[in-house]
Amino acid sequence: MNTAPKQYGFYMPAEWYPHERCWMAWPCHHETWSKIGLDKAKMAYARVAKAIAQFEPVTLLVNPGDEDSATNLCKGHNIEIISLPINDSWTRDTGATFLINNEKQLAGVDWIHNAWGGNYADCSLDNLIASHLIKCTEAQYFHAPLVMEGGSFHVDGEGTILTSKECLLNSNRNPHLSQQEIEQYLINYLGAERIIWLNMGLIGDETDGHIDEIATFIAPGKVLCLITKDKEDPNYHRLQENFEILKSSKDARGRTFEVYTVEQPPATYLNGERLTLSYINFYMANQGIVMPAFGYESFDRLAYQLFVQIFPGYQITQIDALDVFSGGGGIHCITQQQPKSYKLGE
């Protein structure tokens, strides 16, 4: 379908909208997990999948021949396994972006995936994941002629998009498009009205500053952003700038944001490289939040206490996620929610 979803009344709902399920993919890419090895990566993904499965069904995409390891680590936990050839395991970025309309019908956007600006040689199988998910869910299909990853934007479901210039305006994504043209694609394919641009993401983020590491919507008119109090940290000024932008911004409904902050954990290195650790990178499930812990007791505890405060009515589950982040992303990056919907004709 060549026309955009917004024309048909479709929009991406906020992540707190009820979910049908969560989609994940089983680790398989040796280069991605070279710091810790595939076995540890699989155990880390299993922890995330089982934590989410407390709240909603999880469907796990697994490379043919790797079903046994997924079954052994995830069996009996409200987790379905589907065999599908894949290159990597980041469904936030490679899976479909699901939309609904006012009749609660389901649609899916299939973006172009180029492995985060060409970081990896082969992403041909991952470029097919979105269309497979859309077919599996019997959703209405929309192809977007835009290189895009799901971790590069957040929505509030009420007309507002949050994203970063470092990623979306990067010359390794859509160099032929202007900022205005990219904005129009986002508005048309996510069913929105207004875009708030932050500038820079975390130092060393191989995704070029994905928004799901630095800021997110937590409720209508409310955002959570990452900060650091350490003025010597190279992230300090860029995170402070993001905070100031959010404080002075209004959403599509004209509300000035209520801005909450969570402090990033101390700088952590693995094989000489700093990991991009962030408590912002969590998954919001049905009545539950699955958030990371990094082994820093005071930072982990303060983040947990904040989440209890800002997510009333949700059960907060905090899990050891350092191994997930060693691959270059976090809990939000390895998950993709499918909103509850009615099938066409129901």
Curated annotation (Swiss-Prot):
InterPro entries xrefs: Agmatine_deiminase (IPR017754), Peptidyl-Arg-deiminase_porph (IPR007466)
GO process terms (BP): putrescine biosynthetic process
Catalytic activity from the UniProt record: agmatine + H2O = N-carbamoylputrescine + NH4(+)
Source domain of life: Bacteria
A Pfam family recorded for this sequence: PAD_porph
EC number(s) on file: 3.5.3.12
Active site per database record: C333
Keywords, sorted A to Z: Hydrolase
Keyword set includes Glycoprotein: no
Molecular functions (GO terms): agmatine deiminase activity; protein-arginine deiminase activity
Family statement drawn from the similarity comment of this UniProt entry: Belongs to the agmatine deiminase family.
Name this protein carries in UniProt: Putative agmatine deiminase
